Amino acid sequence: MLLPKHHDTLVGIDSDGCVFDTMTVKQREHFFPAIIRHWGLEACADALRACAAFVNLTSKTRGSNRFPALLHVFELLPDYPGVRVSGATLPATDALRTYVHSGLPLGNPSLQAEVARTQNPELARVLEWSLALNDDIDARMRPVPP
């Protein structure tokens, strides 16, 4: 679809509500390292970064909620080159999958309630990751120039 030109400037809004592409910076500088750290995936870090970049930056799932995106990364990761031979222990995903498909609004408040209700350590780790990720972005995210 071609839009008719009405002005000399076009302002586009990114899928996370930003005028500038902060998503790439957030993913590469914050999300990817946090996943690696919280799940001890250093042995397959390159594959994790490639898989997470595909899911979060270049596929049709770009801009999706962090919890379904994390699940998708963990589901695809075993098939990435080098992962199986890396010796990395891949995360269990049953509880995350149940949460993602629960119909609950996906966010830290509902995840906190699910962790309290289920006492599931897998969900607790996801919550720890999500909260630490928010703290890291708040503390270290630099403004992205236009």
Regions found by a protein language model. Give the residues of each.
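Alpha-helical substrate-recognition element adjacent to the catalytic core
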Residues: 6-7, 18-146
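Acidic active-site catalytic centers that drive phospho-/nucleotidyl reactions
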Residues: 14-16
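Hydrophobic "anchor" residues on beta-strands that sit immediately upstream
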Residues: 10-12
